[in-house]
Structure formats: C-alpha cells, structure tokens
C-alpha cells in the first residue's frame, strides 16, 4: 500500500539528541532511536524532525533544511508507518453559498426545460379553462399525500451530525411544516372526500417515487436534500392588483372557475409558506454551514438532474391520471373509490 506523507506533517513525538549520531523520539511511554542514513547528516536529520511541527509544508521543510524532497519522504516514512505523523494542512474547501448557487443554476435551467415546458404546466399555463377539473383536484390531492408524508424526509435531518445550527434550524422548520396537511385537507370537504378517505388512499406512483427519493437523500446525502427544500416549497409571486400571494396554479384555478371552497384552503397554505419564507429555507441553511469539502459542488450538481426528473414526473403523472374524468379521484384500498364531486356542477363553480 502506498503511503503519502501529509502536506503539513506534525511529528507526534519529542525529539532529543542522545549522542553525536543518534536522536531519540519519545511518544508517551514509547521511545524510538533513529540514526541518519545514506548522505543525510545527524544535524540534517534533527533539523527535519524538529521542523516537522505542523506549520511548514514539505517544500518549506526542504528549503529550510537543505534536504531534497525525496529524501524527506525517506526520513519521514517510518514515522508515518508508526503513526507518529499528523496532517495539519488546511484542506481546500468550497463556499457553501457558492455550492448552492451552482446547484440552483442547474436546477432552475432543468425546471424550465423539464417542468414548466412539460405537459402539466403547459396545459395549466396556456389554457387553464380547458384542463379537466379533476386535474386541479388531483393536484391538490397529490400535494396532500406529499405533505402528509413529509415527516418521512424532513425528520431525517433533525439529527444533522456536524452542525448545531443546522439541527436547530431543521427543528424550527419541522415544527413550522407540521400539520400543514390539516390546512389542505379542507379543500376536499366540498368534494365529499374525508380525511379517512385520504388516509386509506394511495398516491400516484409518481408521487410515491418523489417521496421515497427525497427520503433516501435525506438519510444518505442530507446536504443535497436541504438544497431541494427551497424548490419544493416554491417561490410565490406577488399579485400587486390583489395584494396577496399566489402561485401559478392558484391563478390557473381561478381562471378555470374552480370552486372557491377548493381553492381557498390551498391559497391559505400558500400564504402560510410565504409568511415563513420557506422558499428561502435552503439558502438560510447553507448560509449557516462551515466551508464544505472540495468535491461537494460536483456531488450535489450531479444529483440535480434526477431530482428534477422525478419532480417533473410528479406533475406529469397528475395530468396523465386525473386528465381522464372517468377515473376515480381517490384510489382507495379495499373500498369503493370516490368518484363524485359532491354536487359541484362540471367540477367548476
């Protein structure tokens, strides 16, 4: 096995001269005697060992002692093998905010390509009045399934191992998000859908896939999961004429004439998120992080495409399934599916 001498080695032993040609290294109760070899003098050997204090690089030690770099390796390798060398070099690091900026740049580009130019959002944005009402209801339902299972991934970062600040922020975020599904569930009361119907129902496979993927990342790469939170929470836009916060879906639902009893709970949930500024959560988390190891940016950016693909399938799955008005709104297990809109004519107000 090849061994590499640390960039700024520190000798974990005291150096003393025992004779004109012998030095003694003492580490705890263990003592080593070392002698110069080849064309290295005892003075040079002593100078090298005493210069190995963690403050100088190998090139600096070489310049100071006059010992060639390859000879330094020969001298220090036995100490490295014996576990007497520590690395005091400062590792290269990446700025957390620069890392997040790179991830956001890639994700935003992919959002435009795969989501906002995808089937669901093109239908919603371009001709909302032609979209089946069940698609709007399905969007609300699948979001409820997502929210009601949010603890599967949010809870995983509560024990973030390397930062007290992140753990505190994660705990605050978790409490702010807790029971948001209670707000959204009210949207379905006018459709004849109860909480019990939802609890015993199955989300679409595309919704389940996104949930499981986020849960996996929250446990195996929490930093990447944290980078996705701002995207998942959504950045709401301000409608100046009405003085309230809306997102594209709520505007489309209004244009399509979807019943107020369905839209208002979703709007209320959007306002709660806007009030907590959850669209900026990822940036707040990353701003609290210490410098990150080199390679973090490449690792996180490398996962961005899969994330956006799964997110795009979440939306497109809604259009594909709920776009067929003959399919049940709620896919229950072992009971009759809910298929009516509880007296809402044509699904519109």
Regions found by a protein language model. Give the residues of each.
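Alpha-helical bundle segments that constitute or directly flank the non-heme di-iron/ferroxidase center
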Residues: 130-160, 216, 224-244, 312-315
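Acidic, low-complexity/disordered tracts enriched in E/D and polar residues
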Residues: 1-49
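Active-site-proximal alpha-helical scaffolds that flank and shape metal-associated catalytic sites
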Residues: 102-112, 175-264
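Helix-loop segments that flank and shape redox-cofactor active sites
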Residues: 123-132, 150-168, 251-256
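An amphipathic alpha-helical core segment
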Residues: 41, 234, 239-303
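Long, charge-rich, low-complexity alpha-helical segments
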Residues: 36-111
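Acidic, carboxylate-rich catalytic segments that either coordinate divalent cations
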Residues: 280-349
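Alpha-helical transition-metal enzyme core signature, strongest for iron centers
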Residues: 140-150, 170-191, 233-240, 266-279, ...
């Amino acid at each position: 096995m090849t061994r590499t001498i640390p960039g700024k080695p520190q000798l974990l032993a005291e150096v003393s001269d025992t004779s004109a040609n012998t030095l003694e290294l003492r580490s705890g109760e263990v003592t080593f005697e070392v002698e110069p070899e080849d064309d290295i003098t005892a003075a040079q050997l002593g100078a090298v060992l005493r210069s190995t204090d963690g403050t100088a690089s190998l090139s600096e030690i070489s310049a100071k002692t006059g010992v060639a770099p390859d000879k330094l390796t020969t001298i220090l390798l036995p100490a490295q093998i014996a576990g007497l060398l520590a690395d005091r070099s400062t590792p290269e690091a990446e700025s957390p905010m620069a890392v997040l900026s790179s991830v956001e740049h890639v994700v935003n580009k992919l959002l435009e390509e795969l989501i906002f130019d995808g089937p669901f959002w093109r239908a919603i944005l371009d001709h909302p009045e032609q979209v089946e009402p069940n698609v709007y209801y399905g969007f609300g339902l699948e979001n409820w399934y997502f929210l009601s299972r949010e603890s599967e991934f949010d809870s995983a970062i509560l024990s973030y191992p390397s930062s007290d600040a992140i753990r505190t922020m994660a705990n605050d975020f978790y409490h702010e998000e807790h029971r948001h599904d209670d707000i959204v569930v009210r949207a379905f009361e006018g459709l004849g859908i109860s909480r019990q119907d939802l609890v015993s129902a199955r989300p679409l496979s595309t919704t389940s896939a996104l949930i499981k993927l986020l849960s996996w990342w929250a446990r195996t790469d929490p930093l990447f999961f944290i980078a996705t939170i701002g995207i998942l929470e959504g950045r709401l836009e301000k409608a100046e004429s009405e003085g309230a916060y809306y997102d594209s879906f709520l505007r489309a639902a209004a244009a399509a004439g979807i019943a107020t009893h369905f839209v208002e709970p979703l709007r209320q949930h959007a306002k709660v998120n806007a009030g907590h500024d959850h669209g900026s959560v990822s940036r707040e988390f990353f701003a609290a992080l210490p410098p990150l190891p080199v390679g973090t940016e490449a690792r996180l950016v490398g996962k961005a495409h899969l994330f956006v693909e799964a997110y795009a399938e979440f939306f497109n799955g809604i259009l594909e399934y709920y776009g067929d008005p003959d399919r049940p709104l709620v896919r229950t297990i072992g009971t009759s599916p809910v298929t009516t809109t509880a007296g809402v004519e044509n699904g519109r107000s």
